[in-house]
């Protein structure tokens, strides 16, 4: 129980009025990566996250660790090379959350890519990204393309490119990186908002933190303060009076989820839209998800929501490339909207703005990491910690070791790399029956939790009676107990949205088990009736947002 929601207060009380080497603001993939890199080099590190871990951009992406083929179009060769090479590292360090996925890129007469440009583009991509031989691109003619995916539009189809991307669960990736950081001595707290800075002689030396669950205030000191708050980095720079020069430009991306019965896509596709953008359609766990939009966004970054226009745009894109499926809004089972924190570039559309990352340091010494991509999180973290350790060394601290995260498994990833994963899963599937699980349930646990599965097996043994008491099957209760005791799950929405991804990919399961889950959490975390009602309402709002566009919600509220 190293990272339990029951120990949040202990962590906050333990660092109150204390000084650490590094304070990281933001518990998304960037902040988690910095915590892991810093802790493994011997820096005392704490992460403060004002929502839940990965609640911002890091649970709302296209869920691909991808090399950024489209950046070749913008001639961002260095980014493609760096990010492409990182994909394989991210995969090997956590093969239970990231997996290779062959992607089909169909090309039609008049489309973005033609046969020649696709062939050359993918070859350059393979070269830059250092793609291993078995995953190098293939080129298909019209018939081969339709064999791979018969739903693709036949009219004007000339052929297709076939190349490997890596599919991930972004929120799981984030929490696994954070858990590994905790194993190495880092600390992290969710629902802990940094609402101001502490200064000494004009230099930032600490933060004021509010526990958003009970309103208590803490002061924590740090030799270096890193602002890794994603869409909120400028908000923190304003508090530091240092928002000048470069700034963020937020862009919103929406994805829709459709059941495979209605959209039986057998193959991940990267395809043209009518307005010459490109979007992904990806099969996953009995569903197909499609996205993303890319539009400038100036509303509350904490609650980006799908609009009717967003939904219509994606439905039109689906029906343009897959005309036989005839998707309508009735087919949309769930959705999510996220905000990309891009670095503003004058005169560029949202899709044209670079996804590169940069470090900015203010006069007070506040270090901000801005921009960047999910795929590049490890490299970004290494760069930030290199920067921090150099500063500390200049100030007289002894030298710190170099980063070692390149070959370091994340939590759950201790399965002897991708080559060891299938045998590991098979072995654990066979062991599960000893703990009251079916073979299928044990296999699902092993796939989902990787090398942490033994902890879940142990919990299954201990909580058998509780499962009966709270009227939950083991395969619901055990992930919940694990999420609370080992993944600092403080609210029902943390469990259903981020720890399990169920609001997006298994929304009926959420409706089935939400009441039992809420009752269990209320009992174990000692909620008042008011707290239970508040957290229940939060989950209901997340379920509504997944299905009903925000403008329709506003219209309904106005009429009520």
Q: Predicted segment positions?
A:
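Extreme N-terminal leader/targeting segments of oxidoreductases
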Residues: 1-22, 37-41
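Glycine-rich FAD pyrophosphate-binding loop
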Residues: 39-59
